């Protein structure tokens, strides 16, 4: 905990997290509360990890403690939701994240049904590569399935892009213009005589990055 304040102000830090409970121990509770206070102090969004076991109980506890420490629900993304937790998370004003894994947690088909039932507001579809079998294309594959299932394009964009941008953009460190109108790349330039290149690498010179919307 002593080191975290040294990093939260660095460029590109968009949230504190994932933080929260897994086994729901006293130690987890202690540090969860300390990290919530840090997030409040530096005015950053919070990304909450909900436990694998007793998920509903742990999710409710996570929100209760967050509110106890005075965090605004709109600044908090509660991740790894399922059918048991999503209604209460949304009803209480939080962002509800859903992690898509190929064979566990949340399949694309189930995600489609959740968006159909609850709509696109404050729902964030994401993927992960932290353990087990993962798929870096899980989000676009889920978007394609939503499209085939008749979900409006505007709703698909919200749950796979815009809601995450809105939530994490509250940090002041995330602006889509950074990639829509990215500066040209020129690795021949040096800063105070120093180059980013190492070991005889060939410098790259490119125009502005292209961002393609489907």
Tell where the protein language model's regions lie, with residue ranges.
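Conserved, mostly hydrophobic/aromatic
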Residues: 18, 39, 96, 128, ...
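Short acidic active-site motifs
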Residues: 84-85, 110
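Short helix-capping segments at alpha-helix termini
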Residues: 68-72, 118-119, 148-152
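Active-site glycine- and acidic-residue-rich loops that bind
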Residues: 98-108
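Mid-to-C-terminal alpha-helical segments outside catalytic/metal-binding sites
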Residues: 140, 144-214
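Short loop/helix-cap segments at secondary-structure boundaries that form the rim of catalytic
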Residues: 86-93
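Divalent metal-binding pocket/active-site signature
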Residues: 2-84
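Short acidic/histidine-rich active-site segments
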Residues: 118-136, 156
